[in-house]
Swiss-Prot record:
Keywords: Ribonucleoprotein, Ribosomal protein. The gene is rplQ. Residues 118-164 are annotated as: Disordered. Residues 126-164 have a biased composition (Basic and acidic residues). Belongs to the bacterial ribosomal protein bL17 family. One of its GO terms (cellular component) is cytosolic large ribosomal subunit. It comes from Anaeromyxobacter dehalogenans (strain 2CP-1 / ATCC BAA-258). GO terms for molecular function: structural constituent of ribosome. GO terms for biological process: translation. PROSITE patterns: RIBOSOMAL_L17. The keyword Secreted does not apply. Part of the 50S ribosomal subunit. Contacts protein L32. This is Large ribosomal subunit protein bL17. InterPro entries: Ribosomal_bL17, Ribosomal_bL17_CS, Ribosomal_bL17_sf.
Amino acid sequence: MKHRVVGRRLDRTTEHRTAMFKNMVTSLFRHERIVTTTPKAKELKRFADKVITQAKRGTPHARRLAHRDVRDVEVLNKLFDTLAERFKARPGGYTRIVRVGRRAGDNAEMSVIELVDRAPAAAPEAEEKGEKKATKAPKAEKAPKAEKAPKAEKKPAKKAAKAE
């Protein structure tokens, strides 16, 4: 019976699983969007929401607790300075899971897990692409094709053998 059993093992030892989630939550806070398998994304959502809730407290003790899970100081500062302010008014549900299909190699169901109020990073990329298209030179006309050389006549192999 599975009463009061919470979480997934994901076919890993406890140490491997906790290390994996610490690395994944650090990547999630750094990039604000990562692609992973759906079961990992569902577990990471629980893990990340707890860390963001700690960051919203903003106390030195909360920073120490979050530092256990987010070992990169740069990402930890981003979490407490930027992300905590962004999610201040939100009572929970800081992440979103979007299924994106199946992985080609092993047919595993893949998902994108992202922070709900992501920074608008897509707009500058679109502007850059537009600028590149605008500055692109028009294509030059194609040169006319050269005339083909006449092919040499070949005798079939059987006739050539009989002729000798």
